[in-house]
Design a protein with these regions (language model features):
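Catalytic domains of carbohydrate-active enzymes that cleave complex glycans
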Residues: 1-194
Length: 194
């Protein structure tokens, strides 16, 4: 149980860190995507519809309550990770933790499949998750202002230190520091011990 908690929390933290890093760049911004979509509407009703359609396109990929190719248009965008994918993973890990606490197993073998993956409402958990996902699509005003935030170089340096140290716990024999090339502006891994 302790290992499950440790590794699931690390994974969730990685998603949050990814969102923080991506938020430094407007081209990776779900917030910008939503703001631009809303700008196409003239009335509040039209703006909400544009936001709903823009959200649906990159999440459930459909307008109905039982999409067949959900997650088809997955995007690793700031705002979408933090607001959509991270909460989904939190819900999944919470459900698994409940099974661990109760001493019951969780099986996905035999669940209804669509295109090689669990169907949108394959079991009670996925049904509840689907309801949350549909609710997310129907929520308006999701865009964070400003759409970009933070200094990407400072964040990269901080995350490199964090994840290099962490990677050594997982890959003790294969991780080596990267050595600056001659021009000191690019980096290459020469496979040498430093």
């Amino acid at each position: 149980r302790e290992a499950f908690t440790l590794h699931s929390e690390r994974f969730l933290g990685m998603l949050a860190d990814m969102d923080t890093l991506l938020r430094t760049r407007s081209e990776y911004s779900f917030d910008r995507w939503l703001t631009e979509a809303r700008s196409w509407g003239e009335t509040e009703e039209e703006k909400n519809q544009m936001e709903r359609d823009a959200t649906s396109l990159v999440t459930i990929w459909g307008a109905d309550g039982d999409p067949r190719i959900f997650d088809y248009s997955w995007r690793e965008w700031a705002g979408l990770i933090n607001g959509y994918y991270l909460p989904r993973w939190q819900k999944f890990y919470t459900m698994l933790q409940q099974h661990l606490d109760e001493g019951t197993s969780y099986e996905e073998a035999g669940l209804p499949q669509i295109y090689g993956r669990e169907a949108f409402r394959a079991n009670d958990f996925y049904h509840a998750l689907a309801e949350w996902e549909l609710s997310y699509v129907d929520t308006y005003g999701k865009a964070r202002i400003p759409a970009t935030e933070g200094d990407e170089i400072d964040i990269v340096k901080r995350l490199f230190k964090k994840y290099f140290k962490l990677s050594q716990e997982y890959y003790t024999d294969s991780i080596k520091l990267i050595k600056p090339s001659r021009d000191e502006r690019t980096y290459e891994n020469l496979g040498e011990d430093l």
